[in-house]
C-alpha cells in the first residue's frame, strides 16, 4: 500500500470481507494505523486459516483492537504478536482478556492447527505455541467501557456490543475523523446481555457487520418456544439432542433457557430423568468467568443475583462433562458441546456417534460458516466423512434443525442502528458475498432520496485486500491554554457590559423607575455576543493532532521542546530637518513617546536609562524614542532608524512613523513651524513661537481629526466661513450621530453639551481627553 495521504482515509481488509471468518481490518489516516481484530477461518487449517498478513507491513500498526474472544476475531493474535514484525499495542476489554487465555489454550490443544500432520506426513509445527500464548497475554492491555484511551493521537472508546460477554464496538478518532467499528453486535436484549449501545458522538465512517444480510429473525420468545418443544419431543421419544455451541457466548444463553424449562417440567424431565450436559474442555473455567462478571450483564441477571443471593450461572439441571470417557450414554439426553462448527473436538465425536439414528436431533443454534461441517450437515446429506479417516463415511439419519440464537443483528435491527449512527460512509464486513450484496442494495435503496445531496450515503462492500479510499476535510479546533484564557474571559466580560449598557440606556430614559434585572437579562440574551479578537500563537502537535492557542510568554511552559526566535525589523530613512520637528510630529501622531536618550536636550525630558549606564553615556547627538511600547526610533544627524518586533500592531505603527519621516520636511505643518523657528534658539522658544501662531480654530481642527478617524461620516464639525477669524464669543461645536444616539460637543470648553447614550458619551469624553493632551503643547 502507498503511504497514507494526509487527507485520505484508507480501509484495507486482510480478512472477513465478503466472507465470515478471519476478521482483520486495517485503518489508515494522517499517518496513523489501526488494526481491528485478528481471527482465523474455522473452515481452514494452518497458515491457510490466517488473514492475508503478507499483504500488509504489520510493523506500521500503532494499535490493535480486539472486539471479542471468538476464534474468528481473536485466534491469530498470538501469531501476530509473536511471529510477525508487529510492534504496536493491543487492547481488549477485561472479560475478553479473562476468557481469551483459556479459549486460545484449548484452541491450540484441540484443533488440528495446533497438532496436525500434513498430507506429506510431516509434522505441522502449528501457528503458535503455548509459550507464544503466555508471552502475548502479558502484553495485552485492558480497557473499560465508555473510557477514552489516547495513544499518540489515536483516541478510542469501547461501547457494549451485546454479542457475547465482553464484546465491544470501538469508536476511533484520529485528527477529528471518527470511525465506528461494530464488530459482531446484537440489538436484542436476551437473557443475560444488554443490547448494543449507540455512541453519543456521530461517526464519519461506519464499519458494520452484515452476517445475516437482509434476513429477519423471529421474535426471541418464539425461538425459545420452538427450541424447547423440539428438544422435549426428541427426548420423549428416547432420542438424544446435540447442540454444537461455542464454549462461551450463546452456550450460556441456551443453558439459561434449558435450566428454566427443566425446572418448570421437573416431573417429566427433572431429577436426572433426562440429563443435560455441557461438554467442553473449558466447561468449569468458562463458567467461572461468567460467574465473576455478573455485574456486567443486564438488569434481569443482576436482579436474580441480588434477590436470590445465588449466581444465575450455577445451574440446577445441567452437569459439566470434560470428556466422553466419563459419559454414560444409556438413554435420552441433551448435550451442549463445543466447538460450534463441528470441525473437531467433542461436538464432532458426538455427531459421528449419534447421526446414524433417526430418533436423534442435531440442533444448530449459531451461525454456520461456509466450508465447515456445521454448514454441511444443514444440507442434510446422506453421509458425513469421519474426522479420523475422511475416506470412511458415516450414514446420517438423524434429524437436523436450525433455530438461530446467534447474537447478530438481522436486517431491520441493522438498518435502525445504521440510521441512528447517520454516518455518510458505510463499509460492510463479516458477511458472505451474497447476503452482503443484498444488504448493500437494500441500504442504497433506503437512502436513495439522499443521493446527490450533501447528506448522500455511500455504501462499500470491498473484498479482501481491496482498498477503499475516502477523502475528508476535517475541522480543526484549537484549545486555548495559559494566560490567554484569562484574556478571553476579560474580553467577554467587557463585551457583555457594553451590550448591557447600550441596551439598558434607552429604557432608562423612557421609564427609569420600572427597570428591573429581568428586563436587563432579556435584552442581553436577545442578541448574540460579538466575536472576541485576541492575539496569540497557534501551536500544532502533528503527533497527537492537537492545536494549542497560547500567548508567547506561555510557550516555554506548555511546549518546552520549542525554541523561540524574535525577529526585529529595521528601516533607515534620511531626514533633512531638525530633531525638534520630528519629535513634534511624533507627539502629534501618538500623543506621547518615551525618551531613552536625548543628548541635545531636544525634548526637555529626563531620559529613562539605568543608573549604572549613565556614566558610560557620551554626547553623540542621539535622540532615541520608544513609541507605543515596542517601536524604537533613533535619530543621529540626518539618519533616522526605526526598529520593531514583527506583529500586526507594530507593523502598522512602524509604517506610520516611516511615513512621518519621509514627509516631515515637506508637510504643511512643518513648513509653518519652521518658517518661524529655524533661527538659532533653544527648544523652549520653538514651542512658544509655534503656540503663538496656532489659534483656537486650528486647535479644534487638530482635535476634530481624531473624531473624524473614529466616527467617519457620523461626525460633523461646525465652523465659520472665515475659519481663521477670531471670534471668541461664538461657540465652535461638533455633533456625533450614531443611529438614535447623538452627542453635541463644545470644542471651546472641551466638554459635552448633551448626549443621550452613556457608551457614546464615554467614547467622546475619552477622545476629548486625548485630543486635549495632544494639542496642549501647541496652545
UniProtKB/Swiss-Prot annotation:
Amino acids binding Zn(2+) 2: 72-73, 184, 430
Residues bearing PTM Phosphoserine: 517
Positions that bind Zn(2+) 1: 68, 70, 163, 184
Places the protein is found: Nucleus
Subunit structure: Component of the cleavage and polyadenylation factor (CPF) complex, which is composed of at least PTI1, SYC1, SSU72, GLC7, MPE1, REF2, PFS2, PTA1, YSH1/BRR5, SWD2, CFT2/YDH1, YTH1, CFT1/YHH1, FIP1 and PAP1. Interacts with FIP1, PFS2, RNA14 and YTH1.
Main localization category: nucleus
Other observations noted: Present with 17400 molecules/cell in log phase SD medium.
Keyword field contains Phosphoprotein: yes
Enzyme Commission no: 3.1.27.-
UniProt entry keywords in alphabetical sequence: Endonuclease, Hydrolase, Metal-binding, mRNA processing, Nuclease, Nucleus, Phosphoprotein, Zinc
One example GO MF annotation: RNA endonuclease activity
Variant or mutagenesis effect after changing residue 408 to F: Loss of endonuclease activity
Family, per entry: Belongs to the metallo-beta-lactamase superfamily. RNA-metabolizing metallo-beta-lactamase-like family. CPSF2/YSH1 subfamily.
Function as written in the Swiss-Prot or TrEMBL entry: Component of the cleavage and polyadenylation factor (CPF) complex, which plays a key role in polyadenylation-dependent pre-mRNA 3'-end formation and cooperates with cleavage factors including the CFIA complex and NAB4/CFIB. Has endonuclease activity.
One GO CC term on file: mRNA cleavage and polyadenylation specificity factor complex
Cofactor note: Binds 2 Zn(2+) ions per subunit.
Catalytic site: 408
GO terms, biological process: mRNA processing; RNA splicing; sno(s)RNA 3'-end processing; snoRNA splicing; termination of RNA polymerase II transcription; termination of RNA polymerase II transcription, poly(A)-coupled
Cofactors: Zn(2+)
Name the record gives this protein: Endoribonuclease YSH1
Effect of residue 184 to N: Loss of endonuclease activity
Amino acid at each position: 500500500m502507498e503511504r497514507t495521504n494526509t487527507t485520505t482515509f484508507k480501509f484495507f481488509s486482510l480478512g472477513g470481507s465478503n466472507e465470515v471468518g478471519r476478521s482483520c481490518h486495517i485503518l489508515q489516516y494522517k499517518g496513523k494505523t489501526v488494526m481491528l481484530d485478528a481471527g482465523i477461518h474455522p473452515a481452514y487449517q494452518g497458515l491457510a486459516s490466517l488473514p492475508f498478513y503478507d499483504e500488509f507491513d504489520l510493523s506500521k500498526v500503532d494499535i490493535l483492537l480486539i472486539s471479542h474472544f471468538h476464534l474468528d476475531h481473536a485466534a491469530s493474535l498470538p501469531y501476530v504478536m509473536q511471529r510477525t514484525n508487529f510492534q504496536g499495542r493491543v487492547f481488549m476489554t477485561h472479560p475478553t482478556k479473562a476468557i481469551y487465555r483459556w479459549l486460545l489454550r484449548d484452541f491450540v490443544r484441540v484443533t488440528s492447527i495446533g497438532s496436525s500432520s500434513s498430507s506429506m506426513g510431516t509434522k505441522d509445527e502449528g501457528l503458535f505455541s503455548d509459550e507464544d500464548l503466555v508471552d502475548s497475554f502479558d502484553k495485552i492491555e485492558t480497557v473499560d467501557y465508555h473510557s477514552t484511551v489516547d495513544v499518540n493521537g489515536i483516541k478510542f472508546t469501547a461501547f457494549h456490543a451485546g454479542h457475547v460477554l465482553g464484546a465491544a464496538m470501538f469508536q476511533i478518532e484520529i485528527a477529528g475523523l471518527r470511525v465506528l467499528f461494530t464488530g459482531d453486535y446484537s440489538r436484542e436484549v436476551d437473557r443475560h446481555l444488554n443490547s448494543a449501545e449507540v455512541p453519543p458522538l456521530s461517526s464519519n465512517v461506519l464499519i458494520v457487520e452484515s452476517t445475516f444480510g437482509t434476513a429477519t429473525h423471529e421474535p426471541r420468545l418464539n425461538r425459545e418456544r420452538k427450541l424447547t418443544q423440539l428438544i422435549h419431543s426428541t427426548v420423549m421419544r428416547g432420542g438424544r439432542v446435540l447442540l454444537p455451541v461455542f464454549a462461551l457466548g450463546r452456550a450460556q444463553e441456551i443453558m439459561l433457557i434449558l435450566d428454566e424449562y427443566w425446572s418448570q417440567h421437573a416431573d417429566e424431565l427433572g431429577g436426572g430423568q433426562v440429563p443435560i450436559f455441557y461438554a467442553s474442555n473449558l466447561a468449569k473455567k468458562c463458567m467461572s468467568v461468567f460467574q465473576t462478571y455478573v455485574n456486567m450483564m443486564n438488569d434481569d441477571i443482576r436482579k436474580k443475583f441480588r434477590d436470590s443471593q445465588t449466581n444465575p450461572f450455577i445451574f440446577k439441571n445441567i452437569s459439566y462433562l470434560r470428556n466422553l470417557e466419563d459419559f454414560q450414554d444409556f438413554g435420552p439426553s441433551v448435550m451442549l458441546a463445543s466447538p460450534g462448527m463441528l470441525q473437531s473436538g467433542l461436538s464432532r465425536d458426538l455427531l459421528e456417534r449419534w447421526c446414524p439414528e433417526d430418533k436423534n436431533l442435531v440442533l444448530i443454534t449459531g451461525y454456520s460458516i461456509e466450508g465447515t461441517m456445521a454448514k454441511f450437515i444443514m444440507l442434510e446429506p446422506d453421509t458425513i466423512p469421519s474426522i479420523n479417516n475422511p475416506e470412511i463415511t458415516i450414514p446420517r439419519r438423524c434429524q437436523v434443525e436450525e433455530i438461530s440464537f446467534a447474537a447478530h443483528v438481522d436486517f431491520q435491527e441493522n438498518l435502525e442502528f445504521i440510521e441512528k449512527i447517520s454516518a455518510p460512509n458505510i463499509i460492510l464486513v463479516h458477511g458472505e458475498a451474497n447476503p452482503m450484496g443484498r444488504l448493500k442494495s437494500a441500504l442504497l435503496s433506503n437512502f436513495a432520496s439522499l443521493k446527490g445531496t450533501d447528506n448522500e450515503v455511500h455504501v462499500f462492500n470491498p473484498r479482501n485486500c481491496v482498498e477503499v479510499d475516502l477523502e475528508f476535510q476535517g475541522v480543526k479546533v484549537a484549545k486555548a491554554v495559559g494566560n490567554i484564557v484569562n484574556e478571553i474571559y476579560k474580553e467577554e466580560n467587557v463585551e457583555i457590559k457594553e451590550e448591557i449598557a447600550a441596551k439598558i440606556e434607552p429604557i432608562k430614559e423612557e421609564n427609569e423607575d420600572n427597570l428591573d434585572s429581568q428586563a436587563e437579562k432579556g435584552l442581553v440574551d436577545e442578541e448574540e455576543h460579538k466575536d472576541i479578537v485576541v492575539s496569540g500563537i497557534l501551536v500544532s502537535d502533528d503527533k497527537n493532532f492537537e492545536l494549542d492557542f497560547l500567548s508567547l510568554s506561555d510557550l516555554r511552559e506548555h511546549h518546552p521542546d520549542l525554541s523561540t526566535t524574535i525577529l526585529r525589523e529595521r528601516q533607515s530613512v534620511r531626514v533633512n530637518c531638525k530633531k525638534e520637528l520630528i519629535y513634534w510630529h511624533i507627539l502629534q501622531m501618538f500623543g506621547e513617546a518615551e525618551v531613552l536618550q536625548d543628548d541635545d536636550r531636544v525634548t526637555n525630558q529626563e531620559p529613562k536609562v539605568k543608573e549604572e549606564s549613565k556614566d558610560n553615556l557620551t554626547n553623540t547627538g542621539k535622540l532615541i524614542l520608544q513609541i507605543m511600547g515596542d517601536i524604537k526610533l533613533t535619530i543621529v544627524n540626518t539618519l533616522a532608524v526605526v526598529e520593531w518586533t514583527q506583529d500586526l500592531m507594530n507593523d502598522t505603527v512602524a509604517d506610520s512613523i516611516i511615513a512621518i519621516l519621509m514627509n516631515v520636511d515637506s508637510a504643511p505643518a512643518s513648513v509653518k513651524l519652521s518658517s518661524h523657528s529655524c533661527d538659532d534658539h533653544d527648544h523652549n522658544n520653538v514651542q512658544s513661537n509655534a503656540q503663538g501662531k496656532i489659534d483656537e480654530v486650528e486647535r479644534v481642527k487638530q482635535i476634530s481629526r481624531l473624531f473624524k478617524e473614529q466616527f467617519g461620516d457620523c461626525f460633523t464639525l461646525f465652523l465659520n466661513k472665515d475659519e481663521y477669524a477670531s471670534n471668541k464669543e461664538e461657540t465652535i461645536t461638533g455633533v456625533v450621530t450614531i443611529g438614535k444616539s447623538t452627542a453635541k460637543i463644545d470644542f471651546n470648553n472641551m466638554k459635552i453639551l448633551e448626549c443621550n447614550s452613556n457608551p457614546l458619551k464615554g467614547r467622546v469624553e475619552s477622545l476629548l481627553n486625548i485630543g486635549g493632551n495632544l494639542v496642549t503643547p501647541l496652545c
